[in-house]
A protein has these predicted regions:
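Long amphipathic alpha-helical segments
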Residues: 1-94
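C-terminal regulatory/effector modules of DNA-binding transcriptional regulators
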Residues: 68-71, 77, 84-210
Length: 210
């Protein structure tokens, strides 16, 4: 415990990644939550904790599973543990009544079931008082368009971490770009799918970074 406190004080992400990896294997939701809360109390911004710690651990879990070094049961257990922590943190974020005059819709496209990045995005937006609607993972384009009509957002955030077919992916992005630009809605794309964008789509969207 003393070493953990010292590592958190030094914000030693290399150590903390290994530590959280083991905690997720043990399904220690409370312990992971405590580590992240300690970093937040120290003033670490949420986006850095997510990028340096959570996403890193999730990528490691995914890579080990792809290389048959982690069972599907362990992969599911570890991912679900981290997902539960993210939802708990999101529910605890204090929401200020003063909202910034922006409105965001976020989702993943068809076949992309990665839910955790969406929870992270929504938590960060809540922290800076930007209203957001999380449509969840695996949302078809017509459903996104219907929600845009209903909510009238200023920004559309597409989280893309799994692309089954590049042509279908770019076709969906192109359609959403045209739909959004008619309404002056900015389209942001985050995740590994960014590097699969055709140039026309890349130039018409904003890459979501920290």
């Amino acid at each position: 415990e003393k070493e953990l406190v010292q590592r958190i004080d030094r914000i030693d992400y290399k150590y903390l990644r290994d530590y959280l990896f083991q905690l997720s294997l043990q399904q220690s939701v409370d312990s992971i939550h405590d580590v992240i809360n300690s970093l937040l109390i120290k003033g670490e911004p949420q986006y850095r904790i997510y990028d340096e710690l959570i996403l890193n651990v999730l990528n490691r879990i995914g890579d080990l599973w792809l290389n048959n070094k982690l069972s599907i049961a362990d992969e599911h257990t570890m991912t679900e543990t981290i997902r539960n922590v993210m939802y708990r943190i999101h529910s605890e974020i204090s929401k200020n009544n003063v909202k910034i005059p922006k409105k965001v819709i976020c989702m993943t496209l068809t076949n992309d079931e990665h839910e955790i990045p969406l929870v992270m995005i929504q938590s960060i937006l809540d922290e800076i008082n930007i209203p957001s609607t999380n449509l969840g993972p695996n949302v078809p384009v017509p459903s996104i368009e219907s929600k845009i009509q209903a909510v009238n957002p200023t920004h559309l955030i597409i989280s893309s971490n799994y692309v089954l077919d590049t042509d279908t992916f770019n076709s969906a992005i192109s359609r959403l770009i045209k739909f959004c630009h008619k309404k002056d809605i900015e389209v942001l794309i985050g995740g590994s799918g960014n590097h699969l964008l055709i140039e026309e789509n890349r130039s018409a969207t904003i890459e979501l970074k920290n």
